[in-house]
Structure formats: C-alpha cells, structure tokens
Amino acid sequence: MEESDTQEKIMRLIEKSLESYHQGKYDEAISGYDEVIKLDSEYGDAYYNKGIVLFDQNLFEESNKCYDQIIKIDPSHKEVWLNKGVNLFMLKKYEESIQCYDEVIKMDSKDDMGWSNKGESLVCLDRYEEAMACYDESIMINDKSAYVLFMKSKLLFDLEKYKESIQFCDKAIKAGPEDSDVWFCKGNSLKKLGKNEEAEICFVRAKELEK
C-alpha cells in the first residue's frame, strides 16, 4: 500500500473511531484505533484516543499502556503525562501520579491542572502543607477554577481553618457553577464556628442543588 493510501485509510479509521466513541460504542472505537496502530505503530493520536476510551471505562492500567507508548515516541507530550497522572491517581498510586505531574510542571510551570492535580495526590498522602502550596500555585495561574477553589476550601476545613475555608467556598460559588458540595462545606464551617442559622441556609441551598 502506498504511503498516501495508508494515510487516507488512517484518517478514515480515526474519524470512524471518534464517531463510535461519541456514540458510546467503545469496543468499535478501540478496534479502529488498533487498526491504525497496525498500519502505523508510531501514530500517537491513535494511542492517545484509545487511552481516553479506556479511561472512560475505568480501565486505568490499560489506558496507561497507551500513554506509555506515546511517551516512548514523544516524551514531551504534556497532556499525556497529565492523563497518565490521573490514571495513577485513580489507581491510588499517589507517589507515581506526583511524578507525572512534576513532568507536566517541568514542561510548563504555568499549567494550573498540573499543580492542582499534584495537590490532590499530596492530600491523599497527608502532605497538607505541600498540597496547599500546589493549590496556591494553581489559583495564582487560574483563579476562576471553582473546583480548585473548592479543593482548597476543603483542605482548609480539614485543617480546622474554618474562616479561611468559608472565604474560599465563597470564591468557588462566585466562580460557578454552583455545586452542592461547596455549600455543604461552607455550612459545615459555619456550624463549627457556632453560626447555626447561617449554616442551615447553606445546607438548604446544597439540598436544592441536589434535586
């Protein structure tokens, strides 16, 4: 098969596999990506997309096999290191996930997700001060991520810094969209401070959002 014909076939397979993925036909999508890999064993996008399909099925180890193949081809692919770190986090391999996020940060010190994801892994290892520093770095880069603002408020709550926790809950609510977990966190902090009426208002709002 000529090179141009091979490329044409690859593009058709990629397109069809993406369509299958969006239709929830994961097995078909994976088969398509495997066909691409047979035609070109260094076609990074096929491994990357296959990794995402496997992640969506909670097949984290299998997903990382795909990402490892890409790293062999191109170790400077930032998103691959980020995704690999998430898979390792899901497998509760927190130290290994941190190594991946460090690779991301080494490539791009302004990657807010690299910092925030590293923070989450550090929390799971009870390394709270380091985690807080990571959340702070992430927020300095992007102060509009409601999720990271909430993760910081949650950590502050666990460290019994209730007033500060409330401040970051408010920032998360402002950044939006509203989330019941943020309102519950704010309510719990208010309750710890003896502000029961204000806490109840937060709990009511949290329950409304859960409906």
Each predicted region: which residue ranges?
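Alpha-helical segment of the N-proximal tetratricopeptide repeat
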Residues: 8-39, 45, 49-56
